[in-house]
Curated annotation (Swiss-Prot):
This is Effector SCP41. GO terms for molecular function: transcription regulator inhibitor activity. GO terms for cellular component: extracellular region; host cell nucleus. Residues 59-99, 189-230 are annotated as: Disordered. Residues 1-19 form the signal peptide. Interacts with A.thaliana CBP60G; the interaction is direct. Interacts with A.thaliana SARD1. Interacts with G.hirsutum CBP60B. The gene is SCP41. Residues 63-74 have a biased composition (Low complexity). It comes from Verticillium dahliae (strain VdLs.17 / ATCC MYA-4575 / FGSC 10137). Effector that binds transcription regulators in the host plant to suppress the host's innate immune response. Inhibits the host plant transcription regulators CBP60G and SARD1. GO terms for biological process: effector-mediated suppression of host innate immune response. It is found in: Secreted; Host nucleus.
Amino acid sequence: MRTETASLLLLAALSVAEELTPNDVPLACANMCGPIVELSYKCDVDGTDELRKLKRRKLFSPQQQQQQQQQQQQSAPKAKRQADPEPQAPAPVPSSTNNQQAADVIFIPGSIGKFKTIPTPLPPADTGVPSMAVTPAAPAPTLPVLDLRPTTTPTNLNPNLPILATPILPSVPASTPLATASSTQVPLPVGNEADAGDGVDAGPAPSNSLNGNVGDMVDDAGNLWPGQKGRQAASDLETACICSNTSFNVRRVAGLCGDCLEQVSGDQGPMRAILASCNFTTERYEPEKESLVANVRVEATKPSFTQTAAASYSWRVSGPTWAVVVGAGMLLGMGW
């Protein structure tokens, strides 16, 4: 039977890992990893208020889930029987395989199922009377085609007007002094660029880099930027809250939880970051060892973040702590 503490652990993980589904978390490790999930959420810098709101929510018990599945299975056959019958296909129009009969029968538009038979004309009988020869009519005479194209070159009717002709221009020499002078390139000063418009010196080209990569987290002296300092301070507070908690045996529970995940899913997943941050080691998990967390009540105080770095802290959770909080939610958040 699950205790009230176990339900509280699941509710805390739901608010952290909303994108997870029940199939993402192994059910066998739910009880052992529960206290770590709750502790990770309570040590979050600004996430305890949501945990208080989730306490009033209730989960479906296994018996209620089984009854709901049975009701869905019973209602499925009824819905199938009440479905509309499939429409019947229209009867095919009879067709004849005989080419002669198909040519003699035609369909009358506007009448359904009515056909009209046209008698096939029979060839004329041979009576022995010679047939009269038909003389083709003489073709109509064709009119001559007039050719209106001029046969001679047009001449100048007015001798006083000169005939306009395109004068032949003399060829330009291949190289001229002007072309030679314009093709000469003017040397530019080294390190400067000339403007293509007025030829004024444009000065040195701007650099695309600003003290190295733009995404660097440190300045030239190796110090963290103001925003990174706030995130690092929050991460240190949350790590100390988790690793130094004394409400239960955090070291042993975390080690058993990590080994349980290793046995069930083959990988510790996000629990690896928790063990590495706190310098914990794994312990061989066995179902009998779940009695260690049977009556555990997690107590933790949310770290106070009132340092000067709080003014520049714009992230909800820093990088390492995000792995701790969300990773712990992935362990049990949706598996019950």
